[in-house]
Amino acid sequence: MPVEKKWIKRENADAETVSRLSSELGIDPVLAELLVQRGVHTFSQARSFFRPDLADLHDPFLMKDMDKAVDRVHRAIVGNEKILVYGDYDVDGTTAVSLVYSFLARLTDRIDFYIPERYDEGYGVSYKGIDWAAENGFGLIITLDCGIKANEKVDYAKGKGIDMIICDHHLPENDIPDAVAVLDPKREDCGYPFDDLSGCGVGFKLVQAYSQMYGIPFESLVPLLDLLVVSIASDLVSVTGENRILAHYGLKQLNGEPREGLLAMIQLSGLEPMHITIDDIVFKIGPRINAAGRMESGRMAVELLTASDAQTAFRIGTEINEHNNERKSIDRRITQEALDMVRTGKCLSGGNATIVYNPHWHKGVVGIVASRLVEAFYRPTIVFTRSHGGLVTGSARSVHGFDLYDAIESCSDLLENFGGHLYAAGLTLKEENLTAFCERIELFISGRIIPEMQTPVVDVDAMLNFSQITPKFLRILKQFQPFGPGNGAPVFLTENVYDNGNGRKVGAEGGHLKLELIQESHPYHHISAIAFNMAGFFDHIKAGNPIDVCYSIVENYYRGTANTQLRVKDMRERDEMI
């Protein structure tokens, strides 16, 4: 069975507000409660929530340095300077480069893009990239999804006669790089109203500002939004505020008139066209785009996303898909090796963390493997492999509530470099320092982690009876999308549930359950459910015993036909209490 989870029911929303909103909107009180949980308390707020409007996007010139950035881009275009669009090799970086490059290529042919090689140059702005720009006569570099800590690189570029505009969304340090403009909504001196844009989102605000300044119709930017929603979903930024608007219209573009490269990814992923969701991007499209940078080169991803014809897009997409299949094969093998190491006591850490090292593991998948180990053991996790020049590189993933970045930062004197955020980080150190690092970070984690952080939690939004899941309920619930951080798919709890006798094990190894569930109080209302990695409950369920289930409600499409299904988050035998 999977790691046992703790179920926590959210506090009930204010009953009077729920009742009023339910009456005003004519909706089930459970749906009204979900709205109040999301900060929606009035009819007007509900209308804005259910009907996102591009007119409500913030003025891009509210972002610090935006006027300087727009002016410098314009001077480069009218002065016939060469512009280099430079971005990270992950999905956020490659979509950002594709978006800004696609926009500027309409205005100048003196433009190119650059994605650093993951294993040669590493993350962010590189000296090699700047040298390449200088050798090829570029006068302006626009960085995307990177650069906020590239102080020395900016100075280096300036010494070679190259100006830089930084578009980033990561937390800056005390000293901001001395670039022509630094666009980052997380700058302390930036008054922009929404600070959780993706890197691609910051790039979009730049092209929005340029268009606004020089009379380019906003409508011409809408085709770029399919790139932006892929970035928002894949980088796991909040799907609230401005991101909710951008994601909503990005999905409309992706499901209506996607660019050739994304259409190829949809086809190669086996997804149903016109019904793509945030989850589809997170689990199907994003990993494929990421595979280019993990296994080959991020440049291939930009070539895919900027392809102008279907044949080219499908050719590149097919190659990227093959890289993704290779990535999955390597991922499975290394995950099993890492699990075996932990289970046989070959960890480099004690009981409060999971740290493993194998010099032969592929650097492109250690982050994925770290996530798998968190799922298995629910401890802060770092997976290391050998890099080059006597260095080891690691990818870190944390559990809810524990700041692993802070733990890594406490060992910074042992590191060559590191970066990331609360729950995910990357780091590099000399192999000779690995033992000392493991000992120190284990001590740091042991002193700060509490038992509550070591048990995964299922947050239950509301109790629900199956009889409430009507076509109207589903239609309104669908309007809560797009789901994501800050607006997660609601999780419901239904008690005293049985399988109708048709339940079975599914999956290559029979590890999952496909069930037809009924509730004792409503025996004629049955609903399909899928429970991943829960085959351990099969004997209990097959014997006709009751369970309680936590789940979200999803729509699955097959050949254009929608089917409602419960996606089970966790289940308990009926004698256990919440």
Residue ranges of predicted features:
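Functional cores that coordinate and move charged inorganic groups
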Residues: 135-140, 146, 151-294, 298-304, ...
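Flexible, glycine/threonine-enriched loop-and-boundary segments that flank and lead into catalytic domains
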Residues: 344-371
